C-alpha cells in the first residue's frame, strides 16, 4: 500500500506539472461555439447536458479548458504501447522492475481518459487497429497469473489450463448466437478469441510468474477493473465486453485478489451486469469457468469462503450479499431461482446469515433482509396449493354472507332513515320551543325592566312629595303661608303678606281628587249621537241580489232597532247570467224563449253552459259510411267569443249537394243505401217511450258506471249519506264524482218534478240522477268519501318521499368526504383559471357537469378522470365519498312542491271532514276516522315542514337559491356527478390494464428488435418504443428507482442505485399469488 501511496503522490505531482496556465476567456459567441463542441464530445444524457448549459460563462470556460487538457493528454495508442511493453516476455527482470514502477499511474490515466474523454476517443481505443480491449484484458490476466496459479500445484494448473478453453468456447458460442454487434466487431472478437485461446493454451514461464507476482502486489488489478467499468459504461463498449471471450471471465477471476476493495468492486460490477438483459447467463458462465480454473467442488465456493473470512470488511460483505441476492433472484424462471437458491444453501449461506442477523452494520442488514424477503419457501407454496380450494370455498361462503349482510344493511339504513327523520323532527321541535322560551324571556326581561323603572320613578315621586311636604310645614312654621282645608278634602295654600292679611289669589293643591271645574267637566254624560238621516224619497229602495225593504223610521239611540219585516218570496230564476246580476222587482214575468233557428220546424234543446246559450246539434244521418276527419274539436264552452259563435253550419248544408259529397267521399266497403225517409218513420215505432233529460253521451257513460257497481240507486244514495265505503269502493266513488249533477241538470230535473210529470217515463239514468241530486251537500260528501278512501294510500305514498328528501339533505350536508372532493375541484379549477379569470371562492353545483367537458391536451381523459386518479393516489380515504350520500337518487325523483301541495290537500280534506262531523256528530265512521288519522296527518305535516327546512338548509349551504333550485334540479346534480365519477374510476382502471398489456407486448417485441442494426431505419421507432416502455414502468413502479434503457451511463446508474435501494424480486417470499400480491420490480436491459 505504501507503493500505492507513492504512486498517488507521483500522480499528483505529474498532474501539477502538466496543468497549463489558465487562458483568457474568448468572446461570448466563440465561447458558446467551443462549449457546444465540448458538450457534444462528452456524449452526456440530455438532463446532464441541460444542467451544464445553465452554467455561467466562467464555469463554461473552466469546463472547456479541463476537457481540452484531458483530450490532448495522450492518444489511445500511447497507453496501448505502454501496456504491451509490460507484457513483453523478452524484457529482463531488472528492466521490467523499472518499467512497472509507472504501470499503475498509466492505468489510472487510462481510466480517467476512458471515463472523461468523448466517445470518439473510446471508440478509437477499442477499434480494430488498436484492439485496446484485448490488450487491457490480457494485462488483467497477466496481473493475476500469480494469484491464480498459487492456489494449486503446477500439475493441476497444467490440467486446468488445458481445459480452460472449453467453457470459453461454450460461452463464445452462446454469445455469438445472441450477438447483435456489427460484423466488423464480430470478426474482431473472433480473432481476439483465437489469439487469447492460443496464449491460454501455453504454460506461463517462470519469469512471467515472477513478474505477475510483482504486479499483483500493486493496485493494477483494481485499476484494470475500473478501466473495464469505464468502457462498459458506454453502450458500444458494453457490447464489446459482453462479446469478448475472456473479459467477463477475467473480471470474475479477479475475486482471487487479496484486496477486499478490489473484490467488492468486482462484485458490484458483476451484479450490475446480471440486471442487464442476457447478462445473467454470462455471469453464470464466468463462474463456471472460475470453478474449473480454481478447482472448486461447487460453484460459488470461493465466493462463500471469502464472504465468511472477510468479516472485518463491511463493504466487501455488503457487495457479496448484494451479488448473491441478485444472481439468485433476478431470473424469471421460478424453478431456476430455487435451484440457485439451493446452491448457496448447500454452501452454508442460510446458517451464516442466521449468525449475521445481529450485525451492527445497517447496510449489511438491509441486504440480508432483501435476500430473505426474496427467498422462495417451497413448502409454503405447497401449503398454498393445498389450501387454495378450501379458501375459495370459504370465499364463496363469505360472499354469500356479504350478500345477506347487504340486505340487512339496507333494512338497517331504512330504519336509520326513519330514526333520523324522527330526530330531526324532535330537534326542530326543541328549537321551536327554545325560540318560544327566548321570546318569553325577552318579554319578561322587558317587563321587569319597565316595572323596575316605574318603581324607581314612583320612589322618586314619593321622595319629592315628602320633600315638598317638609318644605310646606317649614314655611307654615315660618308664617310665610297658611294651609286651609276645604270641605271636599282639597287643601288651599294661602300666602301671608306683610300686613298680616291673606292674599286674594289662592292656590288650590289637589290631593286625591281633582278641582271642581275639572271634575264637573269629566263626570258629565257624553252628548247623544245625532240621529240617522231620513230617506231621500218615499219610494222603496231595491238592493242587488236581496229583498226589497220598506223605509223604517230612525230609532232613538238607547233602545235597539226592531228587526225588519220578512222579505217577500224571491222571483223565479232566469236563464243565463242575467239572473245573477240584474235585480228584478217581485212578480216579474219570465223572459220569452228564443225563437227557432231558420230552417227548423221543431223547437231545439238549449242548455246553459254558464257563459251563453248553446244549441245542441242533432247528429246527421248519411246514406253511406263516410271517412273520419281527424280534427281537434273545441268544447262547447270554448266557442264563446270566437268566430264559431257567429256562424251557422247547418244553413250551409242546405245549400250544398250532400248526395254528391257522399258519393265522392264514401268509404269503399259499403252496405245497402239507407232510406232516410223510411228510417224516420220507423224510429218512433222502434224507440221507447222513455224521456231523456241528460245529454246522450253523459247518460250512456253513467249507465256503464252504474252497471259496474251492481247497486240500486237507493243503496248508492244511502251509502253516500252515511259515508259507507264498504258498500261503495273508493274507485266507484271517484268514477261517480265525474257525474255530479251540474246546475243546469238540476234545474231541468227540478222543473220536470214541479210539472208533476210521471217519473216512470224517465230513463234509469235520469231517475238515478233525480235521486242523486237530492242528497244534501252532495259535493262535500263525495269529496269526503274520496278523501277517506285514499287517505291511507296518500300517507303511504308521501311519507317515503319526504323521508328521502330529509335523509338525502342531511347526508349531503354532513358528508365530510364530499366536502373534500369539492375542495379538490376548487383547487384545481383555481389553478387552471387563476391566470385568466382570477381565483374564486366557490362555484355553482352545475359546474360539476362541466368536469367531463374539460379534456386533457391529448383528448384522452377529462378533468374528472384526473380528479379520480388524484383522489385514489393522494386522498384514498375519500375515494368512496358517494357511500355517504344516502337516498339521493330517490330524492332526485321527488317533486317537493307537488308533495307539499298534496299535504295541503289532505289538510283541507281533514278540515272538511271535521266540519261535516260537527254537523252530524252521530256518525261513528267519521269519528273513528278523525281519531285514528288526525295524528298521522299531523306527523306527515311535521315531516313536510322538516323536509322543506332541511332542503332549504342544504341548498343554501351549497350557495344555491331554494326558490329557483327545486329537489328535481338539486339532487340530480349529485346523481350525475356520482355516476360520472364511478365511470371515470372504471375507465381509469381499464386504461391501466390496457397500458400494462401494451407494455408486455412491447417487451416481447423488444427482444426481437435487439437483432436489428442501430443504424437501420427501424432504430428510431425502436428508441421510441423503449421510451414508451420506460414511461409505462415509471407509472407502475412507485419507488425511486430508475428504469434503464439502452443508453450510455447505464452501468454507473445501476451500481449507484443498488447502493441505495436493495434489489427486490418480482415475487415476494411466499411466492403465492393467491395469498400475496406480486411486488413489481424493474428489469434492467440494453
From Swiss-Prot:
Pfam families: Drf_FH3 (PF06367), Drf_GBD (PF06371), FH2 (PF02181). Residues 23-469 form the GBD/FH3 domain. Residues 1040-1079 form the DAD domain. Residues 525-537, 548-576, 583-597 have a biased composition (Pro residues). It is found in: Cytoplasm. Residues 538-547 have a biased composition (Polar residues). This is Formin-like protein 2. It comes from Homo sapiens (Human). The gene is FMNL2.
Amino acid at each position: 500500500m505504501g507503493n500505492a501511496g507513492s504512486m498517488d503522490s507521483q500522480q499528483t505531482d505529474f498532474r501539477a506539472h502538466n496543468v497549463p496556465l489558465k487562458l483568457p476567456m474568448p468572446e461570448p459567441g466563440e465561447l458558446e461555439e467551443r462549449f457546444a463542441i465540448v458538450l457534444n464530445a462528452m456524449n452526456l444524457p440530455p438532463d446532464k447536458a441541460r444542467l451544464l448549459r445553465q452554467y455561467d460563462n466562467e464555469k463554461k470556460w473552466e469546463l472547456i479548458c479541463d476537457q481540452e487538457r484531458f483530450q490532448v493528454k495522450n492518444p489511445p495508442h500511447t497507453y496501448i504501447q505502454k501496456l504491451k511493453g509490460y507484457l513483453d516476455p523478452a524484457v529482463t527482470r531488472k528492466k521490467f522492475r523499472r518499467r512497472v514502477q509507472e504501470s499503475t499511474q498509466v492505468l489510472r490515466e487510462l481510466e480517467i481518459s476512458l471515463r472523461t474523454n468523448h466517445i470518439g476517443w473510446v471508440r478509437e481505443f477499442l477499434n480494430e487497429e488498436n484492439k485496446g480491449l484485448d490488450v487491457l484484458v490480457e494485462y488483467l490476466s497477466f496481473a493475476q497469473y500469480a494469484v491464480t496459479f498459487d492456489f494449486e500445484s503446477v500439475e493441476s494448473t497444467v490440467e486446468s489450463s488445458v481445459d480452460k478453453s472449453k467453457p470459453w468456447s461454450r460461452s463464445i458460442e452462446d454469445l455469438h448466437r445472441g450477438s447483435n454487434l456489427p460484423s466488423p466487431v464480430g470478426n474482431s472478437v473472433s480473432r481476439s478469441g483465437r489469439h487469447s485461446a492460443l496464449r491460454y493454451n501455453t504454460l506461463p514461464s517462470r519469469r512471467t510468474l515472477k513478474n505477475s507476482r510483482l504486479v499483483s502486489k500493486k493496485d493494477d488489478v483494481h485499476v484494470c477493473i475500473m478501466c473495464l467499468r469505464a468502457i462498459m459504461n458506454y453502450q458500444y463498449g458494453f457490447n464489446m465486453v459482453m462479446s469478448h471471450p475472456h473479459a467477463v471471465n477475467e473480471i470474475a477471476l479477479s475475486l482471487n485478489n487479496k484486496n477486499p476493495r478490489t473484490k467488492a468492486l468486482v462484485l458490484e460490477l458483476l451484479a450490475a451486469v446480471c440486471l442487464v438483459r442476457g447478462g445473467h447467463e454470462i455471469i453464470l458462465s464466468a463462474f463456471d469457468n472460475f470453478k474449473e480454473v480454481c478447482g472448486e467442488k461447487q460453484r460459488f465456493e470461493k465466493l462463500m469462503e471469502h464472504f465468511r473470512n472477510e468479516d472485518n470488511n463491511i463493504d466487501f460483505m455488503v457487495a457479496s450479499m448484494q451479488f448473491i441476492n441478485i444472481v439468485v433472484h433476478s431470473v424469471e424462471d421460478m424453478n431456476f431461482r430455487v435451484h440457485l437458491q439451493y446452491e448457496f444453501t448447500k454452501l452454508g449461506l442460510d446458517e451464516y446469515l442466521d449468525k449475521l442477523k445481529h450485525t451492527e452494520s445497517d447496510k449489511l442488514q438491509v441486504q440480508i433482509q432483501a435476500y430473505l424477503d426474496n427467498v422462495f419457501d417451497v413448502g409454503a407454496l405447497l401449503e398454498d396449493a393445498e389450501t387454495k380450494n378450501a379458501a375459495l370455498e370459504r370465499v364463496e361462503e363469505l360472499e354469500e354472507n356479504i350478500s345477506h349482510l347487504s340486505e340487512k344493511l339496507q333494512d338497517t339504513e331504512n330504519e336509520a332513515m326513519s330514526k333520523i327523520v324522527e330526530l330531526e323532527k324532535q330537534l326542530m321541535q326543541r328549537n321551536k320551543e327554545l325560540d318560544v322560551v327566548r321570546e318569553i324571556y325577552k318579554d319578561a326581561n322587558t317587563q321587569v325592566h319597565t316595572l323596575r323603572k316605574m318603581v324607581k320613578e314612583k320612589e322618586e315621586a314619593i321622595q319629592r312629595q315628602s320633600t315638598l311636604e317638609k318644605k310646606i310645614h317649614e314655611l307654615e312654621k315660618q308664617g310665610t303661608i297658611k294651609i286651609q282645608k276645604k270641605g271636599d278634602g282639597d287643601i288651599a295654600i294661602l300666602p301671608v303678606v306683610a300686613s298680616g292679611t291673606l292674599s286674594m289669589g289662592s292656590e288650590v293643591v289637589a290631593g286625591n281628587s281633582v278641582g271642581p271645574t275639572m271634575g264637573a267637566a269629566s263626570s258629565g254624560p257624553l252628548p247623544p249621537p245625532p240621529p240617522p238621516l231620513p230617506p231621500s224619497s218615499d219610494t222603496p229602495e231595491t238592493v242587488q241580489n236581496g229583498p226589497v225593504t220598506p223605509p223604517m223610521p230612525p230609532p232613538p239611540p238607547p233602545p235597539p232597532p226592531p228587526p225588519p219585516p220578512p222579505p217577500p218570496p224571491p222571483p223565479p230564476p232566469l236563464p243565463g247570467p242575467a239572473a245573477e246580476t240584474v235585480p228584478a222587482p217581485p212578480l216579474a214575468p219570465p223572459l220569452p224563449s228564443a225563437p227557432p233557428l231558420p230552417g227548423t220546424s221543431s223547437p231545439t234543446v238549449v242548455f246553459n253552459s254558464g257563459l251563453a246559450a248553446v244549441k245542441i246539434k242533432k247528429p246527421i244521418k248519411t246514406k253511406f259510411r263516410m271517412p273520419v276527419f281527424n280534427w281537434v274539436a273545441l268544447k262547447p264552452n270554448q266557442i264563446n267569443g270566437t268566430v264559431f259563435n257567429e256562424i251557422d253550419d247547418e244553413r250551409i248544408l242546405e245549400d250544398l249537394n250532400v248526395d254528391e259529397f257522399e258519393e265522392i267521399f264514401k268509404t269503399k266497403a259499403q252496405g245497402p243505401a239507407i232510406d232516410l225517409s223510411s228510417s224516420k218513420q220507423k224510429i218512433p215505432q222502434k224507440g221507447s217511450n222513455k224521456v231523456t233529460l241528460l245529454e246522450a253521451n253523459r247518460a250512456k257513460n253513467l249507465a256503464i258506471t252504474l252497471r259496474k257497481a251492481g247497486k240500486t240507486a237507493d243503496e248508492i244514495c244511502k251509502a253516500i249519506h252515511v259515508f259507507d265505503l264498504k258498500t261503495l269502493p273508493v274507485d266507484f266513488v271517484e268514477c261517480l264524482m265525474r257525474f255530479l249533477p251540474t246546475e243546469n241538470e238540476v234545474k231541468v230535473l227540478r222543473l220536470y218534478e214541479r210539472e208533476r210529470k210521471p217519473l216512470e217515463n224517465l230513463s234509469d239514468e235520469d231517475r238515478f240522477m233525480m235521486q242523486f241530486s237530492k242528497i244534501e251537500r252532495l259535493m262535500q260528501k263525495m269529496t269526503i268519501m274520496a278523501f277517506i278512501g285514499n287517505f291511507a294510500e296518500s300517507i303511504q305514498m308521501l311519507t317515503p318521499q319526504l323521508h328521502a328528501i330529509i335523509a338525502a339533505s342531511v347526508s349531503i350536508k354532513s358528508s365530510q368526504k364530499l366536502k373534500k372532493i369539492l375542495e379538490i375541484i376548487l383547487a384545481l379549477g383555481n389553478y387552471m383559471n387563476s391566470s385568466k379569470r382570477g381565483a374564486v371562492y366557490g362555484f355553482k353545483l352545475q359546474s360539476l357537469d362541466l368536469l367531463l367537458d374539460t379534456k386533457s391536451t391529448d383528448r384522452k381523459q377529462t378533468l374528472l378522470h384526473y380528479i379520480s386518479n388524484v383522489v385514489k393516489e393522494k386522498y384514498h380515504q375519500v375515494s368512496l365519498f358517494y357511500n355517504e350520500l344516502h337516498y339521493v337518487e330517490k330524492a332526485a325523483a321527488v317533486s317537493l312542491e307537488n308533495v307539499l301541495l298534496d299535504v295541503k290537500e289532505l289538510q283541507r280534506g281533514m278540515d272538511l271532514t271535521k266540519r261535516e262531523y260537527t254537523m252530524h256528530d252521530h256518525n261513528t265512521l267519521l269519528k273513528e276516522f278523525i281519531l285514528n288519522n288526525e295524528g298521522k296527518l299531523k306527523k306527515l305535516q311535521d315531516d313536510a315542514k322538516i323536509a322543506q327546512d332541511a332542503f332549504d338548509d342544504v341548498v343554501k349551504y351549497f350557495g344555491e337559491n331554494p326558490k329557483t333550485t327545486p329537489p328535481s334540479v338539486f339532487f340530480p346534480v349529485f346523481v350525475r356527478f356520482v355516476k360520472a365519477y364511478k365511470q371515470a374510476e372504471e375507465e381509469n382502471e381499464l386504461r391501466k390494464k390496457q397500458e400494462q398489456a401494451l407494455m408486455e407486448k412491447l417487451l416481447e417485441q423488444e427482444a426481437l428488435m435487439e437483432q436489428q442494426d442501430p443504424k437501420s431505419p427501424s432504430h428510431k421507432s425502436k428508441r421510441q418504443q423503449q421510451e414508451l416502455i420506460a414511461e409505462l414502468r415509471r407509472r407502475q413502479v412507485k419507488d425511486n428507482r430508475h428504469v434503464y434503457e439502452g443508453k450510455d451511463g447505464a452501468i454507473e446508474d445501476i451500481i449507484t442505485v443498488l447502493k441505495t435501494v436493495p434489489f427486490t424480486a418480482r415475487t415476494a417470499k411466499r411466492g403465492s399469488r393467491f395469498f400475496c400480491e406480486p411486488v413489481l420490480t424493474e428489469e434492467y436491459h440494453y
